Amino acid sequence: MLLVLLFSLFSVGFGMRVMRRELLKDQPTVLLLGPLEVLTSSSSEDDTPDFPSLRDKRGVDPMSIPRLIKEPPLKKRSGDFKRGDVVYPSAAKQTVPLVRVREPPLKRGQMFLEELLQFNDDAHRQFMDPLRRIRYGPNRLIYTW
């Protein structure tokens, strides 16, 4: 039973249609494979009830798929800019940067090099001296002399 089901799914996947007919009343039902076709809506008088008129099934045109899918707009219409918004510039307007640059805030106790150079006392001069000797202690702290 499982093999018949897998074979029928395989056949339908390759464009074949499974037809069901009864040969005789006392014989079991036989499945026949044929081309993939669908029934027409109009039925003529010369058609037999076992085999109505058939026609080929047509699929969706692959060139019409972009018309079926609605594409999102490429740029935001709001006038306010938030952090992380992506703005696609148009050719008619002046371009805006995609990533807004801002400086990170200073950490507590952080000093710039220019501020260190303003001090004139001996402790800061020794700190700024590039030729000082450094010795590491047992607790890995830096000692200078």
Curated annotation (Swiss-Prot):
Its main location: secreted. Keywords: Secreted, Signal. Residues 1-15 form the signal peptide. It comes from the Eukaryota. It is found in: Secreted. Residues 41-65 are annotated as: Disordered. One of its GO terms (cellular component) is extracellular region. This is Neuropeptide-like protein 68. The lineage of its organism: Eukaryota, Metazoa, Ecdysozoa, Nematoda, Chromadorea.
